[in-house]
């Protein structure tokens, strides 16, 4: 059943309005009547509600993310099921995605892009220190709140993509996915570093480095093509900034930053 305004989940969360929709879930603004605050409730779409394996993964991911409390992460408060509806309750962040912000501004100044990259890195560092790899870092999954805080959202959801969501989901992400992910191989925190490098490229130039007509064409570019200098678009970019992007986006994970801490200190 569709969730409607005024409906309650677990007699606690009152649905106020739908605020977003992704490949596998809808997101609603809700009122938590126990703690008297507004929250975001993410609900698995009806077409996935019968898929036991999917529901289990949805819950495992939510629980792993729930252990993370960090100012640069959209925090997860609760996870559960009510009348066959699997849901995750999260911090409600008023703001826009980094993708929308880049589209609005065309491209970002070096100082601002660097500040955003540092905040994203700090959120990811907290996750990595807890053994959680995001696997889907992209401007669509980074929120800039109305008070200027930068928060990473949708943790580990990339890990739960089963065959039936790949088609709907991967297209948005393939521009940012690492060569090892494009190959369908093993991915770890070094993949997050790569995706953040691509995100930085887009922040600074307004373009993604690899584009094409199909998912496969773009994936092949991640595997085979050298990244073009961001100075092609913005000639005055500092050399140090360009070097950071190059180091994040090395084809071989071993040649990237060893961890977020090393990247943060360079930024």
Please identify what each model-predicted range represents.
Residues 45-67:
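AlphaC helix of the eukaryotic protein kinase fold
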Residues 116-117:
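Activation segment signature within eukaryotic-like protein kinase domains
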Residues 83-97, 101:
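Conserved short submotifs of the Hanks-type protein kinase catalytic core
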Residues 79:
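Activation-segment/catalytic-loop signature of the eukaryotic protein kinase fold
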Residues 120-132:
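Protein kinase catalytic-loop region centered on the HRD/HxD motif
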Residues 15-22, 27:
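Protein kinase glycine-rich loop
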Residues 175-267:
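C-terminal lobe helix-coil module of Hanks-type protein kinase domains
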């Amino acid at each position: 059943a569709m969730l409607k305004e005024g409906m309650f989940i677990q007699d606690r969360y009152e649905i106020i309005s739908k605020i977003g929709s992704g490949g596998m879930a809808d997101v609603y603004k809700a009122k938590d009547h126990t703690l008297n605050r507004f929250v975001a409730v993410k609900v698995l779409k009806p077409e996935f509600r019968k898929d036991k394996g999917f529901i289990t993964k949805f819950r495992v991911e939510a629980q792993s993310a729930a252990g993370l409390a960090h100012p640069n992460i959209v925090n997860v408060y609760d996870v559960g099921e009510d009348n066959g509806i699997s849901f995750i309750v999260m911090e409600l962040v008023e703001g826009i995605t980094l993708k929308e912000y880049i589209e609005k501004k065309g491209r970002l100044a070096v100082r601002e892009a660097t500040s955003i990259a540092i905040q994203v890195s700090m959120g990811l560092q907290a996750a990595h220190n807890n053994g959680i790899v995001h696997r889907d870092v992209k401007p669509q999954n980074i929120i800039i709140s109305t008070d200027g805080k930068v928060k990473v959202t949708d943790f580990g959801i990339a890990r739960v993509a089963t065959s039936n969501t790949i088609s709907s989901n991967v297209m948005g992400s393939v521009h940012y996915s690492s060569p090892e992910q494009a190959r369908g191989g093993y991915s770890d925190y070094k993949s997050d570093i790569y995706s953040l490098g691509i995100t930085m490229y887009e922040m600074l130039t307004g373009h993604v480095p690899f584009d094409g007509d199909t998912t496969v064409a773009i994936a092949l570019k991640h595997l085979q093509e050298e990244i073009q200098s961001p100075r092609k678009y913005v000639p005055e970019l500092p050399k140090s900034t360009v070097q950071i992007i190059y180091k994040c986006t090395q084809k071989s994970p071993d040649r990237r930053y060893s961890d977020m801490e090393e990247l943060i200190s360079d930024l």
